[in-house]
Regions:
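N-terminal secretory signal peptides and thylakoid transit peptides that target proteins
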Residues: 1-18
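C-terminal helical cap and adjacent loop that interface with cofactors, partners, or active-site loops
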Residues: 13-17, 318-375
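N-terminal Rossmann-like dinucleotide-binding module
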Residues: 14-92
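Predominantly a Rossmann-like dinucleotide-binding segment in NAD(P)-dependent oxidoreductases
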Residues: 56-57, 165, 172-257, 369
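Short acidic-hydrophobic, aromatic-tinged amphipathic segments that line or gate anion-handling sites
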Residues: 97-102
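Beta-strand-loop-alpha-helix segment that lines the small-molecule cofactor/substrate pocket
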Residues: 114-115, 121-122, 126-173, 188
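NAD(P)-dinucleotide binding in Rossmann-like oxidoreductases
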Residues: 250, 254-261, 269-332, 348
Length: 375
């Protein structure tokens, strides 16, 4: 495995996410020509094109775009003509901003589109990101970034070559309760954090869906929702893991889960002594919690990772309150502000690549029965 980046770099990117502070000088000067107001809001909203009009785009992203301050729905990419017609009528999208997967390169001539949001199956993220980058667009790609580190690196290289930004859809990095957890940990209000627990899963339905196809998904619940537990642990530890151990239990339905794991339990170890014990599953509903155990008490979120209703608690009885927000609107606005103010995103492709590397190491550990070192 390749070495992880330094803790200093990790803390720098986390601080950007929490505070939204501009850097002393632009680090990506080549993107400045498109949108360069000195204050957010002085120019038009950035146009977002959604690539893939499945459940997430239909029920979360498109409605969220209507609530954003700095974004607007400007285009769509779909392989289904009836969806194109429906979205055109619902959101007033002009014909010139409706594309198929085979015509995405034509976005290069469409100045109404600034950002392409990739919402296709995991194994297609590189394909669609590269097309968007070559059309000169910034890219927000849903998690996980891809199904291999090689494809992740290709995405990073192509977007960098285009002089654009690549962000990964880690919505919880901007969710107020998660930021409150980070504050309590950083300020050591309960002492140093020693142990982190995180669990997220649900009972998956349709056995024919792409999430149960390894070629498209790259894996099972670990790639889909277990990544939230990985991200939570990294955020509180303020580091990337240096060693991982994974275990996949016996499957309750070997036919349905013939291609991917049904569940996984795993442990992440960090260089600062913190460890994280995590669980993810496609077997049951209701698994949605995250806890930090510190020297003088614990604090956590239940539910922790859902789109709505996240709640915080502390063992000392003090409140861990934060506003309820549309997490996708907050995420997209953050990326838009980064582009407008020529500031690098805190959830860049390099973070997505490291997480894919971590998950591949977890699969290796589950397969071999051994702990896998990452650095």
């Amino acid at each position: 495995m390749e070495p992880i980046s330094s803790r200093r770099d990790f803390l720098r990117m986390t601080a950007i996410a929490a505070a939204g502070l501009p850097l002393a000088r632009p680090l990506i000067p080549s993107i400045a020509h498109r949108v360069t107001p000195t204050t957010v809001g002085q120019e038009r909203k950035l146009g977002f094109a959604l690539v893939g009009l499945g459940n997430l785009s239909t029920h979360q992203l498109a409605p969220a775009l209507q609530k954003t301050k700095y974004c607007r729905l400007a285009g769509i990419v779909t392989g289904t003509p009836i969806k194109a017609a429906t979205w055109k009528d619902r959101y007033g999208i002009p014909d010139r901003s409706i594309y198929s997967y085979d015509t995405m390169e034509r976005m290069a001539d469409n100045r109404d589109i600034d950002v392409v949001h990739i919402v296709t199956p995991n194994a297609l993220h590189a394909r669609d990101t590269i097309k968007a980058a070559r059309a000169g667009k910034h890219v927000l790609c849903e998690k996980p970034m891809e199904v291999s580190t090689e494809k992740c690196q290709q995405m990073i290289d192509e977007v960098k070559k285009a002089g654009r930004q690549l962000a990964i859809g880690y919505r919880c990095r901007f969710e107020p309760h998660h930021l409150a957890m980070l504050r309590v940990a950083k300020e050591k209000e309960s002492g140093d954090v020693r142990l982190i627990e995180a669990a997220y899963g649900f009972a998956i339905g349709d056995p024919t869906q792409w999430r149960l196809n390894r070629a498209l998904a790259g894996g099972g619940p670990l790639m889909d929702v277990g990544i939230y537990a990985v991200q939570f642990a990294e955020m509180l530890a303020e580091q990337y893991p240096v060693a991982v151990t994974g275990m996949t239990p016996i499957k309750s339905d070997p036919v349905k889960f013939k291609d991917v794991e049904e569940s996984m339990t795993f442990e992440l170890k960090f260089a600062n002594g913190i460890s994280a014990s995590c669980t993810t599953t496609y077997k049951v509903n209701g698994l949605d919690r995250a806890t930090a155990y510190a020297e003088r008490g614990s604090f956590g979120l239940t539910p922790a990772f859902d789109y709505y209703g996240i709640k915080g608690w502390r063992s000392d009885g003090k409140p861990l309150d934060a506003p309820q927000v549309d997490q996708f609107a907050t995420e997209m606005d953050n990326f838009a502000e980064c582009i407008i103010n020529n500031r690098p995103t805190s959830v860049a492709g390099e973070m997505g690549l490291r997480d894919v590397r971590t998950m591949m190491a977890l699969y290796e550990s589950a397969r071999t029965g051994r702990t896998v070192a990452l650095a």
